[in-house]
Amino acid sequence: MPGRASKYINTLARTWRELNPKGILFWEPWELSAGQTYQCVDLLDPTCVGLSLHSNIAEVQIGYPADRWFKNMLTKAAQRNIPVLGELWTGSPTEEMEPFLHIPTPLATLRALRAVNEAGKLKGIKEYYGNLPEQEDPNLRMTGLFFKNPDISEEEALSQLAKPYREAAREVIRVWRLASEAVEMYPWDVSWLAREIGRSSPQHAMSAAILKGASWQTPSWQANRRVAFMRTDQLEAPNFWMVEDVQMRFEQTAEKLEAALRVADLIQNKLPEPLQHTFRKSIEEMGSFRVRVLAYAYHLRETNLANLIRGASRWGLGVNPDNRNELRAVMVKDQANMGTEEPMGTAIRMLDADPKKFLQTYFLPRASSGKNQDWADWGSAANWTITSPNEFFEKR
């Protein structure tokens, strides 16, 4: 593969050089494994080929910029004088966050820019996915500040960024910090399907929570991305500790979002009028983000608690009342988060009236049909609700 790919790229680049004596063809070695890309660098023509690289072997992740693969690629490229463009998110609309377009995480953006810029020798930095420059976008404006002064401190950058918000600037900075920390805390590494959370449904299945993985038949997915993501298939139920880990990180994310929303709600009417619309959209989207994060956390915790109670019963041990009480409390919060009485109401009543029947009915493993995501219906909740099997949505 490296020999064939590099020969093809070199031919294209040399042809371009014949047409444009100063031309450089920038190539993005997408979906190749780390080993393949390293070998390709050794075979490329440095006189006319450049590289455009994701800042992570798993493409681009705001929480994991400039991974070891990216740094190694910069080292190898520098040794052969091959120019490199580093790719990351420079604005709010990203593949990770869509359909949310207004969640402001400028501090996370600055940290990602700095990590990529300091990873090695770069010819430049470019946007990976695309922006909406006509809207107020603190993330994109932060990128502009960084390009102007890569050594700017976080405090100075946030201060300059918030100037248009006038007397509300200090509180707006607080919102940005909390939202950035929430997105950095979010467990992007659990599965590729953890992205695009706005497409997920808070009304999850009442069977045991799963953690849906995704994978494709490419070198990167069948090699390195098995390390980048905790789940790349759905062949086995996730371990208790994995479920708990992801649940706790979802909870931490939700806490940061709740804190950001408290501050944002207090100041939304104090902003200059031209900035109010986008800020209110940010509040709306952060609220929707939090609802979905909580839905994941609740479903995962309900599953582990139900399994703890079942395990005690199987071993002839008494049920820990703390587990049962916590399970009920989580279900009540989950019901409120769903925004609907059912199906959680029936489950809560059964837990109260007949705990044994409840354990035989709810949060049990569901036999998998082996059905994968239906990408013909890209934006469906079935594809993107990672704790619920696709079949659950088909039967609703």
Language model regions located:
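Substrate-binding groove of N-acetylhexosamine-processing glycoside hydrolases
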Residues: 3-396
